């Protein structure tokens, strides 16, 4: 099983690289629905910052021309971590 913090770093890197194939396995069905809602305003970033909030929750701030922060709650599904809930933070 992947370490959760390693998974967060890989996930954020995949977001920046627009690696959709890598991202697809990162979401539970409920998490995917919320990600699709955020997808109407795509991210454009060159770097990211991660804040571990504890309890399998994280805020990832994507930095580009602007900054966007996405909160997510991760859960272990089988042998991998997936996003069960997410929201954009101001």
Model segments located where?
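Short solvent-exposed beta->alpha transition segments
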Residues: 2-57
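Generic alpha-helical hydrophobic packing signal
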Residues: 36-37, 61-62, 70-72
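Intrinsically disordered, low-complexity regions enriched in Ser/Pro/Gly/Gln/His and often acidic
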Residues: 1, 20, 64-67, 73-75
